[in-house]
Amino acid sequence: ELNEFSPRADRPRREDRPRDGRRPAGAFPRAGRPADRRDARPGSRSRNEAFQDPWVDGQPRFLPMSRAEMQALGWKELDVLLVNGDAYVDHPAFGPVLLGRWLVAHGFRVGIVAQPRWQSPDDLLVMGRPRLFVGVSAGALDSMLAHYTAFRKKRHDDAYTPGGKAGARPNRACLVYANLARQAFPGLPVILGGIEASLRRTTHYDFWTDSLRRSILLDAKADLLIYGMGELAMLECARRLAEGKSLHGIDGTAWLAKVDENNVPVDLPEEWLDLPRMQLPSHEAVQAEATELLRLTQMLEQQVHRQNAWAQQMVGDRALVLAPPARPLTTEEMDKIYALPYARAAHPRYREPIPADEMLRTSITSHRGCGGGCSFCSLALHQGRRISSRSQESILAEARKLVAQSRRGQVAISDVGGPTANMWQAHCALDDATSAKAEPGARPSSRCRRSSCCYPTVCKSFITPQMQHVGLLREVAALPGVRQVRVASGVRADLALNDPEALAAYTGEFTGGQLKVAPEHCAARVLDLMRKPGMEVFEAFLQSFVEQSRLAGREQYVVPYMMSAFPGCTDEDMHELARWLQERHWSPQQTQCFIPTPGSIATAMYYCGRNEDGEEIYVARSDADRLRQHRILMPDFGRMPERGGHADAEDAGEGHHREPRRENTTERWRDERRSADGLAPRHEGRRDFREDRKPPFPRFDDERESAPRRDFRHPDRDGFRKPGFRQDVDKPFRPRPFPDAARDGDEAPQARPSFRRDAQDERPFRPRGDRFVDRDGEEARRPFRP
């Protein structure tokens, strides 16, 4: 079967067909193509301009996605094939693209297959068999998180797909793509990577099936898994395979190994004998005791932060070996990666805009890592708590490229930041002292045993030069062609309070009317479980922000991010948060119901029902409990499971203020006119009328008292249309001017069912959307029509 997200594989595309020995049309402009035809990115150059030269600064203008593009680059064979669950946008914010550029910079030939069809491996065979390996990634998000909401409802859009359409990738994309790769290229190494594989590298809880799952490495039957940021690990994999060496023993990877009689993995690297070893709870132990998942997650968190230990988890009679995490990138390496010639545009193959491209096009990544260590966040587990920052010169050079690539020579930079904007150049004094005493080339390690650099208070050893970040923003704003600079990634409130001068600069110069801050909750007990500072910190930040905005003469607002149904949060805690918002006359717009994503401490607490100290906590586990808590802050969200329709205002919770619904005077005037004409109000029978609290009834119902649509072809309803019938084509049709004309003795034309009849009572079927429903409510298959 074919879909709309991939080119047809059963026939060569038009641009892939040979053209009498001339240059491939897929990589160079075709004769007769209009010069002003644009690609998917609004305001970009024409497709002819985009493909006039396949090379830019020693790199392909776009990594190839077809055989024609390979031929234009002079490549007969790929070294590495990257399979990605996102559309191909050549921007450093997309992980597979960044890794592909990084490998090309080191002499490897890399191709990309973006969002392939998963019914067959044909899309993976377009560019032939790669020489070294196939890399598989589900995309920038976990595929299940990208497909389903916090209430397990199917999402209707996808920001990483052309046109924002959902359905371009399968559920559990890593598993599906890995199976396709093994089917397409038997015997070729398959390497997993990305956020989905990284957070599912050991036994984990899967919220969407409400069950424990073993490591994704076993289910995918892949050869290797790269966790965390994969530049160094993937480059080492390519080099080893090119030299014919083993993939085992690379930092930042995981693999399956056999064990000896002492349950020690065989063929371990010799240099690991002097490293600390962490024995994780086995998969069977986690299945038997729920609290073992919490201990497993805590140990993984320690391993990532300490950086000098390798871990082992038994799964049956085999061992899952986790190598020590890859070291953080240096400033020089970060500068080299982000200096590569990214096109910052979607591949010209796409005809529809990609929402993620629109959001990230003018953003600049200044650093990686986050020292916050929030229990519900996976960034610290994926990127690490150590901050890897770019130099100021590298960021300024990227800003100049943005100006040069803009259509009118002017650009508004939406963000210069990372996971937290005001952590650029942040570092730990203890780690600096340890690194200074270490021998050259030694493996980095950390003496710190804290779970967070900012909880319960900001650590004295955590140095955050926020004024340097402010100076960087001012330098970027002073560049010719830069209209404005904003900080869209948000700031950490407790860090900003420690530097009032930086807070004044963020407020007065780099806030575009709204500043994103994440207090998450106001109950002290819930904040402790989240590893967030107390509410007094946010209130002090809010007071300072309002004062600085007044001094700057600007009307600005704080956008607070709140969370409901967190493990340990009760209905009373949510009512307390609702009262806190009511006292400040705030109507929450950014409220997220907690989603137990794999790998986080909060997910482990959700599964076992205990906090990090082993004490029992309340967990809103069912969808009804989670929805009830969520609707305390957002009364109009969804429907209550125990009854149909929207809930009334009094269900919003004690103390929550709800504005009355504004009356639509136009609808009232129309209803008055219809009543004067003897007709029912227009809203009667409508599904979307909010004041009708009854469950919605079918569109066509013979028993309702409202006036149906007029039809002068059937006498049984006094001239009104009877659903499911049409006029007999064998008899002439004479329209009647009034509904009661059939009562004057005129013979009305007979009608016959337009669809097949029910076998029992010969009653016709009624159309309802894409289905056919008989009068008893039973569904039937739509009849085939050629």
Q: PLM features: residue spans?
A:
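Basic Arg/Gly/Lys-rich low-complexity intrinsically disordered segments
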Residues: 1-44, 636-786
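N-terminal [4Fe-4S]-dependent radical SAM core
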Residues: 51-77, 87, 294-363
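Conserved SAM/AdoMet-binding glycine-rich loop
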Residues: 75, 80-85, 98, 113, ...
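N-terminal pre-triad scaffold of radical SAM enzymes
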Residues: 85-88, 351-378, 412-414, 595
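Glycine-rich beta-alpha loop elements in corrinoid/cobalamin-binding modules
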Residues: 87, 95, 114-315, 322, ...
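Terminal amphipathic helices with adjacent charged low-complexity linkers/tails
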Residues: 119, 247-304, 312-317, 325-329, ...
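Flexible glycine/acidic-rich beta-alpha junction loops that bind and position SAM and/or redox cofactors
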Residues: 142-151, 199-201, 231-236, 259-263, ...
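Conserved, mostly hydrophobic/aromatic
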Residues: 223, 337, 395, 517, ...
